[in-house]
């Protein structure tokens, strides 16, 4: 595991629901009441580290450290963890970190047969712009040499897009695949503190980018315990090229601000 991972933030159910079908460890510092409700109802406390005891839900403390990285940033952006600390927290909770599982998150091309999605007949998708909110925007540009999409994010400080760089390597992040899924997203009712709710059960339009092209399809997630599935226009499960994949769940309201070419 990496020497440093973070910043570590509080848990939200929209992330948990993506992990639940794979029995993945959910590691964070605190969580929304809605997230704890999912943990309680679906009996996921045995794989939840850093949660809250709302609804009498069992908890397991996380292990982390503070590092401002020499920057003037808000306190909530200074908490980090590491492979060693994650293993320690899991050991403290009696949670094993190894088990057999042969299912992947997406349907990736089989490396044993040399299979790939050549994106034949697909429309051009060499640049992609995604808007989540007024200040949360990402853009990608396809680099044919590395066959990856290089990532940029909008900076409120500079007022422009800047390269998204891995702090440990100094290199710009690049992805073999991009998947953009549109979904109804709205604030939980009541005093939720602006915690957002993703209506996964609604499904929606999906855009798969790879090799500088795009395929339009549909995604589905029948319940929190069901995996997210992506289908092409023929109804077949979308074939993903092997490699690092960026997943964006985008509010239907931001559809007009989504563009690619």
Regions found by a protein language model. Give the residues of each.
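A surface/extracellular/periplasmic glyco- and lipid-processing/surface-interacting theme
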Residues: 3-261
């Amino acid at each position: 595991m990496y020497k440093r991972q973070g910043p570590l933030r509080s848990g939200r159910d929209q992330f948990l629901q993506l992990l639940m079908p794979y029995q993945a460890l959910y590691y964070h510092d605190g969580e929304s009441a809605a997230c704890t409700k999912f943990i309680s109802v679906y009996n996921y406390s045995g794989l939840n580290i850093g949660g809250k005891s709302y609804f009498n839900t069992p908890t397991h403390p996380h292990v982390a450290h503070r590092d401002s990285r020499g920057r003037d940033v808000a306190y909530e952006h200074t908490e980090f963890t590491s492979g060693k600390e994650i293993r320690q927290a899991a050991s403290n909770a009696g949670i094993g970190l190894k088990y057999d599982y042969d299912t992947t998150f997406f349907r990736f091309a089989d490396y044993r047969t040399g299979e790939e999605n050549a994106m034949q007949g697909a429309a051009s998708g060499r640049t992609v712009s995604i808007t989540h909110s007024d200040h949360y925007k990402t853009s990608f540009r396809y680099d044919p040499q590395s066959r990856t999409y290089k990532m940029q994010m909008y900076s409120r400080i500079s007022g422009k897009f800047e390269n998204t760089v891995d702090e440990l390597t100094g290199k710009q992040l690049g992805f073999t695949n991009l998947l953009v899924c549109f979904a109804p997203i709205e604030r939980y009712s009541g005093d939720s503190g602006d915690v957002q709710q993703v209506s996964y059960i609604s499904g929606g339009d999906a855009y798969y980018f790879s090799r500088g092209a795009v395929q339009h399809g549909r995604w589905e997630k029948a319940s929190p315990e069901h995996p997210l599935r992506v289908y092409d226009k023929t109804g077949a499960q979308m074939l993903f090229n092997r490699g690092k994949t960026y997943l964006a769940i985008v509010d239907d309201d931001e559809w007009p601000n989504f563009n690619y070419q």
